[in-house]
Regions:
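Ser/Thr/Pro/Gly-biased, low-complexity, turn-/loop-rich segments
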Residues: 1-183
Length: 183
């Protein structure tokens, strides 16, 4: 946590011969800054610039070192991206500023432009556990359970047909319908 993986210099005979960013190798597999070391070379490891934590529904949640000017989109790229159950439209960020913390809800269209600073904490939530197109049928039907609500399953008659009809023990004089939404 003290030394940088992003700003490493190789000095030879008093002259800087290379700047090495280990993330280029670790995250992208690029060896663009690969240099052969010689006897007497000095390797200078700078202190880190910005450490940013990311937790929640990303593939590699942990603390990352970010260079000055790197965006939230870059951080998400370093994590390997979102998991399948991540809510991608907005992420929450906590930033320490002076004496207090500030919270930001960053929309997906702003990921490229939102610049991270030292000690930012990013949280990616999961999608909600509710359904937007679900109807359930229970009781004296052959296939009780959840069904997709769409133009095909738009009537109770069609729902009963999808549940493979009523069983012989069904009480045909009454049914109970419970609606959870006003629409």
């Amino acid at each position: 946590r003290i030394g940088s993986l992003r700003t490493i210099q190789v000095v030879r005979s008093g002259m800087k011969v290379a700047d090495v960013d280990v993330y280029e190798y670790i995250m992208k597999g690029k060896l663009t800054d690969d240099i052969r070391l010689s006897e007497g070379d000095v390797i200078l490891v700078s202190p880190y610039e910005n450490l940013v934590g990311i937790s929640g529904k990303v593939k590699r949640p942990m603390i990352y070192e970010m260079k000055h000017g790197e965006s939230l989109a870059t951080l998400i790229g370093y994590t390997g991206g979102f998991t399948g159950d991540a809510y991608r439209n907005t992420v929450r960020l906590v930033r320490r500023s002076g004496r207090e913390k500030q919270i930001y809800n960053v929309d997906q269209q702003d990921y490229d432009n939102f610049i991270l600073t030292d000690n930012d904490e990013v949280s990616v939530e999961a999608v909600l556990g509710r359904f937007s197109n679900k109807v359930e049928i229970h009781g004296a039907v052959y296939r009780a359970g959840m069904y997709q609500l769409d133009s095909v399953t738009g009537t109770i008659k069609r729902l009963i047909q999808q549940a493979e009809g009523l069983r012989g023990d069904a009480f045909l004089n009454r049914a109970l319908l419970r609606r959870e939404r006003e629409d």
